[in-house]
Regions:
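Class I S-adenosyl-L-methionine
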Residues: 1-95, 136, 166-169, 193-201, ...
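Signature of N6-adenine DNA methyltransferases within the class I
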Residues: 9-10, 14-25, 47-54, 81-87, ...
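A secondary-structure boundary/capping signal
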Residues: 116-117, 187-188, 342
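Short, conserved catalytic or adaptor-binding loops enriched in Gly and charged residues
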Residues: 66-70, 102-110, 203-207
């Protein structure tokens, strides 16, 4: 990330390729039916090197505008926090204005009103804009100065949890749209499924209309290579219109031409209704969305599939270098050590333990209480040797008498409970069973316990494509195609109720537990799923699940099979 010398802040600059800019500009003009730019007001909230501003100015100049008109003064507002960017862009725009026969003095006057150096989120705008377009900065939460975090939280309802700075850029930019205005950003797609994006998704659903959502997470639409998981968004106020959507694998001109709005042979899927409220945007294909909706209507979630079924995450110590494997550097009472299983210990649904231990500061018999270190002199000496670092943590300052506590409470009963263990980031289906209650999970491992389920049967269900596909729908995509099995995602998974499974079906699932043959496992699960409900069989990605006339969320055409 680049830092602005004058401001001393991370600017989050990622510049957009010209063909992608052209696609966005054409889409905005099509959506807003803007035949001419003259008389319009355009806003670019984070103009950078002018990837959007320069083509906009050139298109405006091609229409032979009156440079001395009020319309010329109000045509453009472009902001950037970098004074260096603003100066470079000022020179480039001035050059184009003068080349188009605009007097230098008038060009300078236009530039004075057009280009603004400063924090867009803190700027005040009296006018509303017909086009808001750009590529907002991608600055992670931890790189936002704490003073500005507080300021943004007070100003923007969408700035929740640990969200990145593009989220309030969305909120403010949308608020500046005119009634007939059109908004378009290219930026990460993280908010469409993440927890921190809930408020922004709800704001968009309640007040605006998504005209286009083009998922480009497997492409590289930027000048430099970055891991941004990008998407193009076009949003307006026309809430009675359809939504166009697609996922593309490259950002080249031929592909972009195939997903242009208004083209008779476009490969865009068309939704009669986009996602409601804060629901995650699970798919760009309306057939997949309806299939997922049908699963949700047919089956309960995991925690509701049987009484006493719980989902949780392993322990975060707040100082792994101190709490994990302390026995390798010091003598520790064995009763203070818990076998700890981490994500790297789980491969192909099996546990291969690396003999790491967690130094447990909590009482084994009452995990709401800390250990009495007077009874454990070796552990006490070890904690004392690390006291400065442990006491400096926020959780220790908040509980000074319990300064040696872990960040999360260690629940000793969980260690001895049979449980399913699921690494967070994986390609899918890597689900293991701690049948005897031998391990405590680390914070990158999620766990499931149940009083009713046969855990081998549940484990097979969770390994199947039936469940992996659901996780993939609600998870953000990671590098290499990995997905996240976070608790929030697991809680959105729907499976047959335990009570709906016959003894024979339970036996089929259990018999498949030892198999590494995914096709066999999927066939078993598919048969069990079909048999567990009297309704029409449900397959998340069955190609012929719906004809286009049957699909209740679609209109016109689906994305052609590719």
């Amino acid at each position: 990330m680049k830092k602005d010398v004058q401001q001393g802040e991370v600017t989050g600059e990622v510049f957009t390729r010209p063909e992608v800019v052209a696609y966005m500009l054409n889409s905005v003009r099509h959506c807003g039916k803007f035949k001419s730019l003259v008389g319009l007001r355009v806003l670019e909230p984070s103009c950078g090197d002018g990837a959007f501003v320069l083509p906009l100015v050139e298109a405006w100049l091609s229409e032979k505008p009156d440079f001395d008109s009020v319309d010329a003064d109000s045509f453009l507002r472009a902001c950037d926090i970098s004074s260096e960017n603003i100066e470079k862009l000022r020179g480039a725009v001035r050059e184009r204005l003068i080349a188009a026969s605009c007097a230098r003095a008038r060009a300078n006057a236009l530039l004075a009103s057009w280009l603004v150096c400063g924090d867009f989120l803190l700027q005040e705008f009296k006018e509303r804009f017909d086009i808001v377009i750009g590529n907002p900065p991608y600055i992670r939460f931890d790189d936002i100065p704490s003073a500005k975090q507080k300021e943004y939280r007070a100003m923007f309802s969408s700035f929740t949890e640990r969200c990145d700075i593009y989220v309030p850029f969305f909120e403010k930019s949308l608020a500046l749209l005119s009634d007939k205005g059109v908004f378009s950003f290219i930026c990460t797609n993280r908010f469409t499924k993440s927890s921190y994006g809930k408020q922004l998704r709800r704001l968009i659903a309640d007040r605006y209309h998504v005209a286009l959502y083009l998922n480009m997470e497997h492409t590289q639409p930027f000048v430099q290579e970055v891991s941004a998981y990008p998407a193009i968004y076009i949003i307006d106020h026309n809430r009675n219109r359809v939504t166009y959507s697609a996922t593309i694998d490259d950002a080249g001109i031929p592909t972009l031409n195939r997903v242009r709005m208004g083209q008779p042979k476009s490969e865009l899927s068309v939704f009669k209704q986009w996602y409601k409220g804060d629901s995650p945007w699970i798919s760009t294909d309306c057939r997949e969305r309806e299939a997922a909706d049908k699963i949700a209507r047919t089956f309960p979630t995991i925690t509701k599939s049987a009484e006493g079924t719980e989902i949780g995450i392993g322990v975060a110590s707040g100082a792994d270098d101190i709490y994990i494997n302390a026995q390798r550097v010091a003598s520790i009472e064995p009763s203070c050590l818990l076998p700890l299983v981490a994500s790297e210990d789980i491969h192909d649904g099996r546990i291969s333990w690396d003999e790491r231990y967690l130094l447990n500061p909590y009482d084994d018999n009452d995990d709401t209480q800390m250990r009495d270190l007077a009874r454990y002199p070796l552990a006490a000496a070890y904690f004392d040797s690390h006291a400065p670092k442990l006491k400096a943590r926020y959780c220790a300052r908040k509980h000074p008498h319990d300064w040696y506590r872990t960040l999360d409470r260690v629940k000793y009963a969980l260690l001895r409970s049979p449980k399913i263990l699921i690494p967070d980031i994986q390609l899918g289906g890597n689900v293991a069973l701690d049948e005897c209650g031998s391990y405590y999970p680390h914070h990158n491992v999620y766990w499931i316990t149940s009083r009713k389920w046969n855990l081998k049967a549940l484990c097979v269900l969770l390994r199947s494509s039936f469940v992996t596909s659901q996780i993939r729908n609600v998870s953000v995509q990671m590098r290499g195609g990995s997905i996240r099995y976070q608790a929030q995602n697991l809680r959105n998974v729907h499976i047959p109720a335990w009570s709906s499974l016959s003894e024979g079906n339970v036996e089929k699932l259990v018999s498949a537990y030892e198999s590494n043959d995914t096709e066999y496992l999927d066939a078993v699960v598919d048969a069990v799923v079909r048999d567990s409900t009297a309704r029409q069989p449900v397959r998340l990605f069955q190609a012929d699940l719906f004809n286009k006339e049957e699909c209740p969320v679609c209109q016109i055409e689906h994305v052609p099979d590719r």
